[in-house]
Amino acid sequence: MLADIRYWENDATNKHYAIAHFNVWNAEMLMGVIDAAEEAKSPVIISFGTGFVGNTSFEDFSHMMVSMAQKATVPVITHWDHGRSMEIIHNAWTHGMNSLMRDASAFDFEENIRLTKEAVDFFHPLGIPVEAELGHVGNETVYEEALAGYHYTDPDQAAEFVERTGCDSLAVAIGNQHGVYTSEPQLNFEVVKRVRDAVSVPLVLHGASGISDADIKTAISLGIAKINIHTELCQAAMVAVKENQDQPFLHLEREVRKAVKERALEKIKLFGSDGKAE
């Protein structure tokens, strides 16, 4: 069933678990994630983003995302990740995404506020929630180099940002990074604590693939309510491909779906959302 992300993010915040956000851009990933959520009786977020349009036509794939969300036996949110323009997120909304991220984190503070508020002012009257980002979670690179110039979320700006934009949730930059970490992630949990104390909206952790289970649990205990996973699903799928490369293609596809399901199930249980949709 299609669900409202605001309900589940607030529930996660209040009950100290996190809802899993999985980027999906083909049938095997989508079905594997839904399989996992249904088995775990967990709410789940299925998401698409600009980085995947070279592999999949979003305008076509979105129909499958929405259809499977509607038919699922658990609450499912359809989300657009890292929308870097109004045109992009408007297109996502017109194709059935019921949650949007307006990512203007690459801009300075005032421009981030302006662009985020523009999205909020447009989509809130339509009943669509908007996630924003303060600080900047970069893309895959040498992790040590990324840390040298890392733009952490400024806790002193968080309350003003949320108040002026009206965003529904806030992605924080605490040493996390998209893609594969080239060394052990070094997360600044003091930033999470201070931002959590400063704002009332749910907090989001991007780039969580490769972060240790212990650090994930710490982040959740400090108030992270939504956690984004993509790279680990891809890694699980690639292992399945390698192990079944001599098998018929139909068999290989089923094994990829199973591998994605198993990895998604691990994350759902780690985040503590299993059983929440019973």
Curated annotation (Swiss-Prot):
Pfam families: F_bP_aldolase. GO terms for biological process: carbohydrate metabolic process; protein homotetramerization. InterPro entries: Aldolase_TIM, Class_II_FBP_aldolase, FBA_II. It comes from the Bacteria. One of its GO terms (cellular component) is cytosol. GO terms for molecular function: aldehyde-lyase activity; identical protein binding; tagatose-bisphosphate aldolase activity; zinc ion binding. NCBIfam families: cbbA. This is Uncharacterized protein YdjI. It comes from Escherichia coli (strain K12). The gene is ydjI.
